[in-house]
Amino acid sequence: MAEGQVLVLDGRGHLLGRLAAIVAKQVLLGRKVVVVRCEGINISGNFYRNKLKYLAFLRKRMNTNPSRGPYHFRAPSRIFWRTVRGMLPHKTKRGQAALDRLKVFDGIPPPYDKKKRMVVPAALKVVRLKPTRKFAYLGRLAHEVGWKYQAVTATLEEKRKEKAKIHYRKKKQLMRLRKQAEKNVEKKISKFTDVLKTHGLLV
């Protein structure tokens, strides 16, 4: 991948820890990474156990002044961000710079809805977990521990998918028309295409 190019990853269907480890390595190497659809990230193990773990984490606070930390993020994107932070030397200049190169989002906001999104095969649930194993969704966990925007994110995602469908339909139609147009003029331009082929300008 070219230096300075932004790597846009679709978090849906990836395992939390495995994806976080790969993202942490990439940002340390100097790549800019954007992770979208964090609410679709999976966690191995059944939902109830994962919720108990998170509730235990919520109880960890400073007795005399809880506002001093530790801070418990509720949004799936921030939970993922904190997981990555735990894999970086974030108290050093290098680690802080790496963390600044990471952006995380719930849903797919513009301009990333128009960009090609990648997956990480090494972190995919279907590749890494046995089909019989239980797993939980980060979005559901976040919702049950205090995230307020699950419904809003779902609505916006539905709207985005509808828009994408219309765009794809138009694109297919244009491609069909282009092919038809090429077919219509094929005989007329055959002598020109033959000349171009002899000069190696057309394959």
Curated annotation (Swiss-Prot):
Modified residues (N-acetylalanine): 2
CDD domains named among the record's database cross-references: Ribosomal_L13 (cd00392)
Post-translational modification (record): Phosphorylation at Ser-77 upon interferon-gamma treatment in monocytes involves a DAPK1-DAPK3 kinase cascade and is causing release from the ribosome, association with the GAIT complex and subsequent involvement in transcript-selective translation inhibition. Citrullinated by PADI4.
Span of the signal peptide: none
Pfam families assigned: Ribosomal_L13
Keywords annotated in UniProt: Acetylation, Citrullination, Cytoplasm, Phosphoprotein, Ribonucleoprotein, Ribosomal protein, Translation regulation
Gene Ontology cellular-component terms listed: cytosolic large ribosomal subunit
Modified residues (N6-acetyllysine): 191
Predominant subcellular localization, coarse grouping: cytoplasm
One Gene Ontology biological process: translation
InterPro entries for the chain: Ribosomal_uL13, Ribosomal_uL13_CS, Ribosomal_uL13_euk/arc, Ribosomal_uL13_sf
Any one GO molecular function term: mRNA binding
Citrulline found at: 59, 140
Positions of modified residues (Phosphoserine): 77
Subcellular localization(s) per the UniProt record: Cytoplasm
Annotated PANTHER family: LARGE RIBOSOMAL SUBUNIT PROTEIN UL13, RIBOSOMAL PROTEIN L13
Role description: Associated with ribosomes but is not required for canonical ribosome function and has extra-ribosomal functions. Component of the GAIT (gamma interferon-activated inhibitor of translation) complex which mediates interferon-gamma-induced transcript-selective translation inhibition in inflammation processes. Upon interferon-gamma activation and subsequent phosphorylation dissociates from the ribosome and assembles into the GAIT complex which binds to stem loop-containing GAIT elements in the 3'-UTR of diverse inflammatory mRNAs (such as ceruplasmin) and suppresses their translation.
Subunit structure: Component of the 60S ribosome. Component of the GAIT complex. Interacts with EIF4G1.
Family in the record: Belongs to the universal ribosomal protein uL13 family.
Protein name stated in the entry: Large ribosomal subunit protein uL13
